[in-house]
């Protein structure tokens, strides 16, 4: 019989119990022993669920208190020297992730091309890796008590781990330093009864992976020689694996391949017979989107694969970390739509149905699922209606002309100060929103409350003497879901939460049909804010690429068509804002780079589509209307030509946690437009010093002119507390004024 495996399960819990427990601990409202007790119960619940769903190999080690990469750094003592004062305990673990009053947090980067963030391991001259504790063994022993020999340890492999690290001087030597530690972890697991061990090596779906194949042979020869009893699974995901003709010869029991995002290439490798002597762990249910699987199409794929492998195991294409837990609470949705959704729990059921069907037993549940899938495909809300683009202006006047007109209209000082858009959402704001959603607060009372918050924060910004203000986005849960509630073709879930970083969870909207602008999105709040001040207030919108990348997108049309549908809707809102007197409009593309394909050969087509969609949205404005955009953590040197091609008058970029690395992109490339490189890290509660911000501004001014540089935090301030926000912005404004004075002198 074919087996079913899982790569990873969501940490959050059905009701976000994980998030609530960790944040209660941070706030001092939960003792560590109680936190550990609650997290253990969550882990056990997750294990039991997967066992009951019929999963034969259940992941252990996918659960974390913050991030699985940080877990490995902590286990191997790869800890920055600045945290030496700490004992090796949970306080240190969270300090590395979040920073403290004296130390900046470690950098945070996107996990490949997802919206999950990992904590970057920092290697220094002083780093002395050793096995601080075998936490994976502890988790395995715990899991065996619940699921027996179904427990399958999961660990990020050494080559991927080092590839994701900073401060590496000698790559191969660093990998070699870790091998004895991995060996000990593996041997302890085998001694405790483990058989299969999943080693995640997703770096081998990237172009970089092609350069690491020889190192992989050395590493996995070592593992096979030193821990011969282990059944290692070399796991890849998010794309087709590179160099499979060579990797397939590694001395491992099985290979995990993604047949959703790398189907053609991986299938071709299988049909070449590369895995005839291997177990194949086939990722055939999408671990990153929420649509029910096409059972018949997938069964046909399995029948293609089957004859070419020694043994076949079915699994999701990636960890289910990237999807919500269950659809069972989404009773408000149209039944056809709800029945066409598949979150983590439903995906496990789909795998069971496929395994049974592949073994020759198409159950009643199989036929019912097939019927639900067909009903969604036939639904009348899916037409691919794309308005004609013939009348849409795609180019603006030259930047120098626009810059002069905007300078005359706005009358801003050099080094203008602003924020990215959102301000803290206090418990009171959340309480009012919840009361309104439950019908316990009238629409008018809720709007009045939002206006009160806008009025209060406009006054705070004026007191701080910021130059360009924002309304604060108090009406928004997040920068994508809010738009999903107002555009046709979107819907939102009640509990469709997904982890983004640490305890931060997002609830991506679902794009299920044709997207259209049917009502104002942010007009009322923005116009009200502008009526309270003579300073310019930015209109705040999210761009088409970010809306797509941070939504669960429909999978029945091309991404370029979807980008353009959303761009036309955003264009309509921009025109409303401009007609209402809003002189600066920010169209955030925070996730533009996040959606970049992992393979270079596929990247330019995506970037071309992204630039075209941004221009559809923004190019119809008058020359004196200033278009801003904002982008999050990224390697910008790789896409700087496309950033320039967006032709935004001002771009702000998250840079503080990269410790200046992004600035190097602009030291080697001419960037002619306005730009703000974030001068302090908003992801940490730590208040920056005036000297730090001055240094960041001065370094930026070495490669950017004072006429083009803006001063801003590196991201929105929604997750910070009010006192922290005001204190940090006071420092930002004071530092900027001092630099202005230096420039004047």
Curated annotation (Swiss-Prot):
It comes from the Bacteria. Binds 1 zinc ion per subunit. Its cofactor is Zn(2+). 5-methyltetrahydropteroyltri-L-glutamate binds at residues 16-19, 110, 550, 594. Keywords: Amino-acid biosynthesis, Metal-binding, Methionine biosynthesis, Methyltransferase, Repeat, Transferase, Zinc. It catalyses: 5-methyltetrahydropteroyltri-L-glutamate + L-homocysteine = tetrahydropteroyltri-L-glutamate + L-methionine. InterPro entries: Cbl-indep_Met_Synth_N, Cobalamin-indep_Met_synthase, Met_Synth_C/arc, UROD/MetE-like_sf. Pathway: Amino-acid biosynthesis; L-methionine biosynthesis via de novo pathway; L-methionine from L-homocysteine (MetE route): step 1/1. The active site is at 683 (proton donor). One of its GO terms (molecular function) is zinc ion binding. Its EC number is 2.1.1.14. L-methionine binds at residues 420-422, 473, 588. L-homocysteine binds at residues 420-422, 473, 588. Belongs to the vitamin-B12 independent methionine synthase family. Catalyzes the transfer of a methyl group from 5-methyltetrahydrofolate to homocysteine resulting in methionine formation. This is 5-methyltetrahydropteroyltriglutamate--homocysteine methyltransferase. It comes from Streptococcus agalactiae serotype V (strain ATCC BAA-611 / 2603 V/R).
């Amino acid at each position: 019989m074919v087996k079913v495996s899982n790569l990873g399960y969501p940490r959050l819990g059905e009701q976000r119990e994980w998030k609530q427990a960790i944040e209660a601990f941070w706030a001092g409202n939960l003792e560590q022993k109680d936190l550990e007790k609650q997290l253990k119960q969550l882990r056990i619940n997750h294990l039991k669920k997967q066992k009951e769903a019929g999963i034969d190999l259940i992941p252990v080690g996918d659960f974390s208190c913050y991030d699985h990469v940080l877990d490995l750094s902590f286990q191997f003592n790869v800890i920055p020297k600045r945290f030496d004062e700490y004992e090796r305990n949970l306080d240190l673990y969270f300090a590395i992730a979040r920073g403290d009053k004296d130390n900046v947090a470690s950098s945070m980067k996107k996990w490949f091309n997802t919206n999950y963030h990992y904590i970057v391991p920092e290697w220094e001259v002083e780093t002395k890796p050793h096995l601080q504790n075998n936490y994976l063994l502890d988790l395995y022993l715990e899991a065996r008590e619940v699921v027996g020999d179904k427990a399958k340890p999961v660990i990020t492999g050494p080559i991927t781990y080092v590839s994701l690290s900073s401060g590496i001087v000698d790559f191969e030597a660093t990998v070699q330093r870790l091998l004895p530690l991995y060996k000990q972890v593996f041997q302890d697991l085998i001694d405790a009864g483990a058989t299969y061990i999943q080693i995640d090596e997703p770096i081998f779906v990237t172009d970089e992976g092609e350069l690491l194949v020889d190192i992989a042979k050395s590493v996995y020869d070592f593992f096979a020689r030193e821990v011969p009893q282990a059944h290692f699974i070399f796991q890849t995901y998010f794309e087709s694996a590179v160099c499979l003709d060579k990797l397939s010869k590694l001395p491992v029991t099985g290979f995990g391949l993604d047949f959703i995002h790398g189907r053609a290439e991986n299938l071709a490798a299988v049909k070449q017979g590369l895995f005839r002597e291997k177990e194949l762990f086939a990722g055939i249910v999408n671990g990153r989107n929420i649509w029910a699987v096409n059972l018949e199409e997938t069964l046909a794929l399995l029948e293609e694969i089957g004859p070419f492998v020694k043994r076949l195991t079915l699994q999701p294409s990636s960890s289910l970390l990237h999807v919500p837990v269950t659809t069972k609470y989404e009773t408000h949705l149209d039944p056809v739509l709800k029945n066409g959704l598949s979150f983590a729990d439903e995906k496990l059921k789909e795998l069971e149905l496929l395994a049974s069907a592949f073994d020759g037993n198409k159950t009643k549940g199989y036929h019912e699922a097939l019927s639900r899938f067909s009903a969604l495909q036939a639904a009348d809300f899916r037409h691919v209606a794309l308005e004609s683009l013939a009348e849409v202006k795609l180019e603006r006047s030259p930047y120098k002309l626009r810059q002069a007109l905007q300078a005359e209209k706005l009358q801003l000082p050099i080094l203008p100060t602003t924020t990215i858009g959102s301000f803290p959402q206090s418990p009171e704001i959340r309480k009012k929103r919840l009361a309104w959603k439950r019908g316990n607060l009238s629409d008018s009372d809720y709007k009045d409350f939002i206006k009160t918050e806008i009025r209060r924060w406009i006054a705070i910004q004026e007191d701080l003497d910021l130059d360009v203000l924002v309304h604060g986005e108090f009406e928004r849960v997040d920068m994508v879901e809010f738009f999903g509630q107002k555009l046709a073709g979107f819907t939102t879930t009640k509990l469709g939460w997904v982890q983004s970083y640490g305890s931060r969870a997002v609830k991506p909207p679902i794009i299920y049909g044709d997207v259209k602008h049917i009502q104002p999105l942010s007009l009322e709040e923005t116009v009200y804010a502008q009526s309270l001040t003579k300073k310019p207030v930015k209109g705040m919108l999210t761009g088409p690429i970010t809306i797509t990348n941070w939504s669960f997108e429909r999978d029945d049309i091309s991404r370029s068509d979807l980008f353009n549908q959303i761009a036309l809707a955003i264009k309509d809102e921009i025109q409303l804002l401009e007609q209402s007197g809003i002189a600066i409009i920010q169209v955030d593309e925070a996730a533009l780079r996040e959606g970049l394909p992992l393979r270079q050969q596929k990247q330019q087509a995506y970037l071309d589509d992204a630039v075209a969609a941004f221009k559809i949205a923004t190019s119809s404005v008058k020359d004196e209307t200033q278009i801003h955009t904002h982008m999050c953590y990224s390697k910008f040197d790789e896409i700087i030509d496309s950033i320039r091609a967006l032709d935004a008058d001002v771009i702000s970029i998250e840079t503080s946690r990269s410790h200046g690395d992004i600035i190097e992109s602009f030291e080697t490339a001419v960037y002619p437009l306005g730009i703000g490189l974030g001068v302090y890290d908003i992801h940490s509660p730590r208040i920056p010093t005036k000297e730090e911000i001055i240094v960041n501004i001065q370094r930026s001014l070495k490669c950017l002119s004072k006429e083009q540089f803006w001063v801003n935090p590196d991201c929105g301030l929604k997750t910070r507390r009010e006192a922290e926000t005001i204190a940090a912005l006071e420092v930002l404004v004071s530092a900027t004024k001092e630099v202005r004075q230096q420039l004047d002198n």
